[in-house]
């Protein structure tokens, strides 16, 4: 906190006083003031409600008919005027998240979602609702993944539920299936990988005729990773089968994303990294070749994903008893995880550290 404050020329209490404050905040004996909340939000990747243990639901306001009709009229014009701006803002937040991590984006993302939820609430006809709901579905999955990365699992789960509802409102099985597939990772991280597998398989059965080949490949790769997390001979076989299916489904078109599904980044290079991750979890010796190939071709702007590659290489070297190489990659994984503030990868780094 002191380093953060010094960099921004903020006046805060001494180190000794801060230790007392932190203890009292944790025990509920002292309220978090606005000044310290502004510092803690980007440091912890938490919302005001999470810091203060409050309900985020706003108090209803007693608005009259004039105000209601004004909001409805404003929302009716949004699909033509504001939706492109919503999409551009989501893309900017996605880029910032990919390169710098999610912890410093909590306020921006919450404000972004609130604006779209407000617009959707007062959009009446399907023609006005669908574009806003589509934008909200994509932004909500991004917000959910950011929350999961920050260790805010309750917020992550609720954001995925918001994304699914928005996708249903948008009549978009693509965004619905993607939200279900990502939500499965919350279950896996919570210790329910078998339930996660069932959810991602259900996502693949959600209007498959309307899913793009890239989305189908993404869901198959997610199933492979989650099956590997369950373990056991049957799930190992299922993981390998799902990997083969992902490889067969992924279009060889040189593209990374679909124009109508911008939430997914997946090409042959990304799938190679994913395959290496799954094979490392299965203890397969061929994981090493896949992972080093992925590392050589990795996009440096995918900072968090590169931390994952180094974690996977650590795991692969540990399986072969190559401790020096494992330590080298673990150190790189730790540096990248700290750079993005990823609680999720920091946790994985600590688990791997315990095996050295």
Segments predicted by a language model, with ranges:
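Short acidic, glycine/proline-enriched loop segments that cap or flank alpha-helices
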Residues: 10-13, 300-302
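Short secondary-structure junction/hinge motifs that connect adjacent elements
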Residues: 1-3, 15-18, 109-111, 130-132
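Short amphipathic recognition helices of helix-turn-helix/homeodomain-type DNA-binding modules
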Residues: 3, 11-77
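Conserved binding/catalytic microenvironments
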Residues: 78, 83, 90-356
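Long, contiguous hydrophobic alpha-helical segments, chiefly transmembrane helices and signal peptides
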Residues: 1, 22-25, 40, 145-146, ...
């Amino acid at each position: 906190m002191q380093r953060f404050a010094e960099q921004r020329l903020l006046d805060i209490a001494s180190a000794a006083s801060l230790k007392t404050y932190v203890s009292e905040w944790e025990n509920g004996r002292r309220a978090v003031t606005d000044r310290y909340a502004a510092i803690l939000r980007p440091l912890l990747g938490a919302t005001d409600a999470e810091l203060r243990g409050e309900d985020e639901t706003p108090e209803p306001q007693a608005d009259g008919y004039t105000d209601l009709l004004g909001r409805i009229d404003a929302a009716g014009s949004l699909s033509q005027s504001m939706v492109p701006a919503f999409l551009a803002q989501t893309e900017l937040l996605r880029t910032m998240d990919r390169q710098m991590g999610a912890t410093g984006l909590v306020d921006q993302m919450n404000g972004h979602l609130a604006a779209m939820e407000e617009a959707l609430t007062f959009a009446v006809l399907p023609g006005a609702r669908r574009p806003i709901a589509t934008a909200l579905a994509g932004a909500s999955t991004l917000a959910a993944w950011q929350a999961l990365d920050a260790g805010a699992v309750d917020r992550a789960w609720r954001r995925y539920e918001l994304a699914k509802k928005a996708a249903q409102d948008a009549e978009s099985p693509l965004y619905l299936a993607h939200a279900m597939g990502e939500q499965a990772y919350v279950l896996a991280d919570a210790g329910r990988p078998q339930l996660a597998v069932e959810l991602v398989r259900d996502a693949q059965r959600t209007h498959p005729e309307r899913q793009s080949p890239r989305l189908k490949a993404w869901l198959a790769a997610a199933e492979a990773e989650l099956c590997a997390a369950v373990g056991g001979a049957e799930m190992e076989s299922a993981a390998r089968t799902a990997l083969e299916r992902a490889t067969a489904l992924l279009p060889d078109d040189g593209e990374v994303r679909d124009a109508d599904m911008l939430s997914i980044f997946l090409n042959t290079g990304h799938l190679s990294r994913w395959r290496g991750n799954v094979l490392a979890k299965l203890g397969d010796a061929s994981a090493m070749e896949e992972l080093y190939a992925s590392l050589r071709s990795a996009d440096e702007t995918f900072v968090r994903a590169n931390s994952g590659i180094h974690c996977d290489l650590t795991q692969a070297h540990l399986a072969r008893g190559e401790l020096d190489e494992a330590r080298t990659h673990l150190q790189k994984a730790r540096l990248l995880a700290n750079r993005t503030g990823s609680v999720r990868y920091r946790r994985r780094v600590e688990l791997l550290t315990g095996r050295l």
